[in-house]
């Protein structure tokens, strides 16, 4: 007796014997196929790609022969990408400035058993981050005396940096050589000027 796939219920079986001439009486019995909890089946999830410092959400789906309520669990193979599930929506959030790839594993659970895991790759593409210039305190210099400052900045991408500067007044000229900023007041000038520096 071979029940159909996922069938549960009862069936009546009638059995007779025959000697090729006459048949016996018929024996009837009932077969009961008891239900078992079927494992949910999680739908495949495509690989995903996002830019650095962005999040992404994907919708999850699964089937369950028993019609059980499905919940989902997800995990990342790196602490640089966090996973969070609300209902059937999976949200993935990389940490700030992370780029690279993460393998995400997802399972569906029907309250009793887990599905086979589905894995996919989340690729986080790098973007060029703006450098951060170290703050410069207000400066003073005697009349007719140039002043040279050493500039400093950081860049999470490790790029080579150049500097530029602009003076708010023609009475103070600025020049940049490497990371050195030289401020040269005009002859006999005294007063103030605002210097804007960028990296």
Give residue ranges: language-model regions:
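Acidic, turn/loop-rich segments in luminal/extracellular domains of secretory-pathway
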Residues: 1-38, 46-71, 75-129, 137-199
